[in-house]
Every structure is written in structure tokens, then in C-alpha cells.
Amino acid sequence: MAYIPRLMSSLELSIESHPLLHARAFITDFPAALGTSPSPSWLISKLVTTASAPMESDDEVRSAVRELLRAGGYKPTGRGKPASEYLLRAAGENALSSINMAVDLCNAVSLHSGLPISVVDLARASGPFRIGVAKPGDSYVFN
């Protein structure tokens, strides 16, 4: 059985078991609408490759992410590469800017860890949700 944090017990989310998939999820609330709360300067300062961070992406992480995507039949190349790789390139070109607090937090973690992260607005999406490796014939929106 997959790990599901206690906070998520009321959310319909399944995380399928797969040897390459190590998914985690959490729910958070923000004190105000994201459009009215700009990201703090300390967070924006993390959106560059030279920022101090407790973790660092490396080739092993990038290879593992690509291997997982290929296991589902996805070709992580060109415009379809993992978002974490796009963030690394954009930050290196000083083209990564603030969007909102939720996205900026996840982008900063993704940039420095190399792990792809998704943000889902539960006020705009409805479950059940599934995290898993795509099966033949599945289609999905990526990036």
C-alpha cells in the first residue's frame, strides 16, 4: 500500500505501487487568495540556480525521473522534457520569475531537487486523483 499522509485521508487519491515511483502528496491552505499575496523575497531569491538550498539536483536524479517517464511510454525529450529540467534551464537563463506563492514554493524545490512537482488547486479540480505510471493507451497532460 502506498504512503498517504493523514491530512489526505479525506481526499480521494490513489498512489499506485511501482518500483520507480516514489510519490508524496500534501494539502495546504494559504491565508489569502494567491493572486493577492505576492511571494516573499526570500522565496523569490530561491528561483535561481546559485541559491543556497538543502538539496541539489544531479544526473542520477534526472536519469531516475526520465526512466520513470519512459516506463509509462512517455518520451521525455524536446518540449516534453520534465518540468524540473525546464526550470533548471530557465533559472540558468534568468528567465524564471515569480507566479504565485504555491507555484514558487514548488518551483524552488523542484529546481534544487530535480524532482518534478505538480500543484493542484482543489477548488478547481475534483477527484478521484491518481498518481501512477501510465498504461498503454493512456493520455495525459504533462507540463
Task: Tell what function each PLM region has.
Residues M1-N143:
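Charge-biased, low-complexity intrinsically disordered regions
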